[in-house]
């Protein structure tokens, strides 16, 4: 498994924890890092922290995009795993220009298949692709 995939999977776990606990993001991140320091290798730490902090800071914007792009689903009703996977991918598409949007979407779909429900991959793919089109995010990629 690649470093970025590991960082994304750990970030998903941290964001899930934030969603359930509702405490201070800084305190929860410090506690998460303390509890899982053996799993947060130095090679993945910067990307992991960028994802967690970035998603936390951009959450209102990201959640608004998800609400506008998911038919009949409000973010609050989405499975916690799915919504946090999509939050990471949307953050990457909006704020990480070095990562092609198709990579962010594909990674999200694969992580959704691993950690979500049977339908998570298709749901995540549909919402993220709508957002990619809505925000005109292609960075020169060919369809």
Curated annotation (Swiss-Prot):
Gene3D superfamilies: NusB-like (1.10.940.10). The keyword Transcription regulation applies. GO terms for cellular component: cytosol. Pfam families: NusB. Keywords: RNA-binding, Transcription, Transcription antitermination, Transcription regulation. InterPro entries: NusB-like_sf (IPR035926), NusB_fam (IPR011605), NusB_RsmB_TIM44 (IPR006027). GO terms for biological process: DNA-templated transcription termination; transcription antitermination. GO terms for molecular function: RNA binding. Involved in transcription antitermination. Required for transcription of ribosomal RNA (rRNA) genes. Binds specifically to the boxA antiterminator sequence of the ribosomal RNA (rrn) operons. Belongs to the NusB family. This is Transcription antitermination protein NusB. It comes from Desulforapulum autotrophicum (strain ATCC 43914 / DSM 3382 / VKM B-1955 / HRM2) (Desulfobacterium autotrophicum).
């Amino acid at each position: 498994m690649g470093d970025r995939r590991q960082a994304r999977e750990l970030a998903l776990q941290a964001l899930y924890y934030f969603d359930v606990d509702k405490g201070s993001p800084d305190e929860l991140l410090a506690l998460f890092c303390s509890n899982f320091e053996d799993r947060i290798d130095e090679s993945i730490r910067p990307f992991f922290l960028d994802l967690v902090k970035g998603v936390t800071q951009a959450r209102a914007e990201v959640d608004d995009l998800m609400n506008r792009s998911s038919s009949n689903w409000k973010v609050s009703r989405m499975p916690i795993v799915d919504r946090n996977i999509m939050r990471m991918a949307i953050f990457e598409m909006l704020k990480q220009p070095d990562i092609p949007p198709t990579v962010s979407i594909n990674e999200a779909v694969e992580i959704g298949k691993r950690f979500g429900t049977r339908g998570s991959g298709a749901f995540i793919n549909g919402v993220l692709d709508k957002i990619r089109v809505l925000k005109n995010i292609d960075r020169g990629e060919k369809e």
